[in-house]
Regions:
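N-terminal, positively charged/glycine-rich alpha-helical extensions of SAM-dependent methyltransferases
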Residues: 1-18
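Conserved beta-strand signature within the Rossmann-like core of class I S-adenosyl-L-methionine
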Residues: 141-148
């Protein structure tokens, strides 16, 4: 099926709460565990683009107490929930939250040792926005670790994934999940994007619905 761009970012309070209360612990912990295993000494100054309710960055901060993380999201409702979660975890000194969109967030060029993102790319109407920002804000040889949904072959395939993964979740979350699957890119499309952006990253499917884009920027 062709890509169907999502109607809006998750800035509705009901959507944000449904997403924050959903159980993404398995995929979020997988992401953190593999990031740390793949790049154990490269995580010092980290940025998470599209941080959502901050579950990933909280898990990373607990795993790597020496890391400082700048976490960015464009949805005010999501940043509010992220702030509550970071405060409850006692990690305010380790995690800085910023509400804003890319491009536009005032981040200095070549600032970060590692650039992370999980389940954010598919929200963007133009994916090159993300790849250009990655090149701009990463230091030479910075780690890039991005995990996102990939688009199923048909809408029916997307519905099967929704029912398998989110059968017990709220209807609003299931609708958002279906829309996200339809808005996601295929691994081949992402490879084309990376070539256009001159980014030397690899793309690998890691589950029935997720792909992992990883590597380092040029030194």
């Amino acid at each position: 099926m062709e890509r169907i761009i999502e109607p809006e970012l998750m800035d509705d309070d009901r959507q944000a709460r449904a997403y924050a209360h959903a159980d993404f612990s398995t995929s979020n912990q997988w992401f953190v565990d593999h990031l740390v295993a793949d790049f154990p000494t490269a995580l010092r100054s980290v940025v998470d683009l599209g941080c959502g309710p901050a579950d990933v960055v909280i898990r990373l901060a607990r795993t790597k107490p020496g890391v400082h993380i700048t976490a960015i999201d464009g949805a005010a409702a999501m940043i509010a929930m992220a702030r509550d979660a970071v405060q409850a975890a006692g990690l305010e000194q380790q995690i800085t939250l910023i509400e804003g969109y890319i491009p536009g967030v005032p981040l200095a060029d070549h600032t970060f040792d590692a650039i992370l993102s999980k389940d954010f790319l598919h929200h963007l109407p133009d994916p090159m926005i993300l790849w250009h920002e990655v090149r701009r804000i990463g230091k030479p040889s910075a780690v890039v670790y991005i995990m996102d949904l990939f688009r199923p072959a048909t809408p029916d395939d997307a519905r099967v994934i929704v029912e398998r993964v989110a059968a017990g979740e709220a209807p609003i979350l299931k609708t958002d999940f279906f829309n996200s699957l339809c808005a996601a890119f295929t691994p081949t499309e992402v490879e084309d994007q990376l070539r256009a952006a001159s980014l030397p990253l690899t793309v690998e499917p890691v589950s029935e619905r997720h792909m992992l884009i990883k590597g380092r920027l040029a030194g």
